[in-house]
């Protein structure tokens, strides 16, 4: 029970930072949905751009967060050597990615439909490269059981972002959607500066043999991560390419993206649980009663997520005021998206069996099947049912 109490304490800290952060982020939804008229498609651009960067984030971390936890807790390799190797690997690939993408910025932006505003894409490419690098120091904070600093840095980003967005979109009555991306870049840079202590005080070593083992372990998790993030963002990436009316696509995507934000309450709970549960599982894997603790953790997770689902459904008539009135037409997707997030949380909890026995290939198999179904449904049905096909997929 002591282990479960520690898990509950850390989940509460991670959860409060996540819940407070997401709640404060909700302030951006009424700001954007009132400052950016639905017919402008501005919120659709934001939805699409953040979906693309979410996928890139998974690609650029390529499962190394979980790999770091696994090898740091194994007791075979020096944890700081594992941290250094992970940091150098992810940092190098993020830098290479950024150089290549910025070299071909105009063709990439044109392909994605932002040929007239390539700087939108340029700013977000820099953001996602920095985010990928920061993911490893954040994982290190979780490994060292320092949830307070973890939460403080996350909240710093949120508060700075909200303050700047309010200043521009409310105070200055601005309507340039590109400023939202510039604000994200500024706030991400601020967090990077505040993370300097996690980047000094140790010897940087790239252990190639260790890296080879970590990549072998982490690659199937990358496939799992791609499938997991596609479950959340594939619809928002595919939608502009498949929807029959290209001009209307960003409008409809904006409505769907705004309404889906209400369902993100479930994502908050699953994310908070994940932040605490992942290091908890690996640290307790050698104890005799570990399976019993995992089962109890799953039971409480399901209970709390079901209560959250019911609470949102009961108070949806109040929660809808988070959105601008023109976006209310999309509220019918909320229960569907919330249920999907709950099932993803359950799947994440159950997926640890193959991570603990180093058989992560099974995660890749399951993920490829699920990902294929999601993409197929979106491509086949968006043109017929619009964003409702996205929700059901």
Residue ranges and their predicted role:
Residues 39-40, 105-124, 250, 312-344, ...:
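Interfacial segments at transmembrane-helix termini and the short loops linking adjacent helices
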Residues 118, 122, 151-200, 224, ...:
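Hydrophobic alpha-helical transmembrane segments
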Residues 2-65, 94, 98-102, 127, ...:
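Signature of the first transmembrane helix
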Residues 31, 60-76, 259-299, 351-356:
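Helix-loop junctions and terminal segments of transmembrane helices
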Residues 1-7, 148, 178-179, 193-232, ...:
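Interhelical loop/hinge segments that connect adjacent transmembrane helices in multipass membrane
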Residues 7, 68, 136-143, 147, ...:
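C-terminal transmembrane helix end/exit motif
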Residues 71-74, 130-153, 202, 339-369:
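Membrane-interface junctions at transmembrane-helix termini in multi-pass inner-membrane proteins
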Residues 26-42, 109-110, 173, 226-265, ...:
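Helix-terminus/linker motif at the lipid-water interface of multi-pass membrane proteins
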């Amino acid at each position: 029970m002591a282990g479960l109490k520690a898990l509950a304490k850390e989940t509460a800290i991670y959860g409060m930072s996540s819940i407070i952060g997401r709640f404060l982020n909700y302030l951006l939804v009424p700001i954007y949905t009132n400052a950016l008229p639905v017919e402008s498609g501005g919120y659709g651009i934001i939805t699409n751009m953040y979906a693309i960067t979410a996928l890139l984030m998974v690609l650029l971390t390529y499962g190394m967060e979980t790999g770091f936890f696994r090898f740091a807790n194994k007791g075979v390799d020096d944890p700081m050597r594992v941290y250094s190797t992970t940091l150098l690997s992810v940092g190098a690939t993020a830098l290479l990615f950024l150089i290549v993408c910025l070299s071909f910025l105009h063709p990439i932006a044109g392909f994605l439909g932002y040929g007239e505003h390539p700087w939108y894409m340029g700013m977000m490419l820099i953001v996602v490269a920095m985010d990928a690098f920061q993911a490893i120091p954040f994982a290190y904070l979780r490994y060292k059981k320092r949830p307070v600093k973890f939460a403080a840095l996350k909240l710093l980003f949120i508060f700075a972002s909200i303050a700047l967005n309010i200043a521009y979109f409310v105070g200055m009555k601005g309507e340039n959607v590109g400023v939202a991306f510039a604000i994200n870049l500024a706030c991400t840079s601020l967090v990077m500066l505040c993370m300097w202590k996690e980047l000094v005080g140790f010897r940087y070593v790239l252990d190639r043999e260790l890296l080879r083992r970590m990549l072998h372990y982490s690659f199937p998790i990358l496939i799992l991560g791609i499938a997991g993030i596609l479950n959340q963002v594939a619809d928002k990436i595919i939608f502009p390419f498949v929807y029959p009316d290209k001009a209307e696509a960003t409008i409809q995507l904006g409505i769907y993206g705004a309404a889906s934000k209400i369902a993100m309450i479930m994502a908050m709970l699953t994310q908070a649980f994940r932040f605490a549960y992942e290091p908890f599982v690996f640290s307790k894997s050698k104890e005799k009663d570990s399976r019993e603790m995992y089962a109890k953790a799953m039971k409480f997770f399901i209970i709390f997520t079901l209560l959250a689902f019911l609470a949102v459904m009961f108070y949806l008539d109040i929660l809808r005021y988070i959105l601008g009135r023109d976006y209310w037409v999309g509220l019918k997707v909320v229960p569907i998206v919330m249920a999907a997030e709950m099932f993803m949380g359950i799947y994440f909890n159950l997926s640890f069996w193959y991570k603990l026995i180093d058989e992560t290939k099974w995660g890749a198999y399951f993920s490829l099947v699920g990902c294929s179904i999601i993409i197929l449904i979106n491509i086949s049905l968006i043109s017929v049912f619009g964003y409702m096909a996205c929700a059901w997929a």
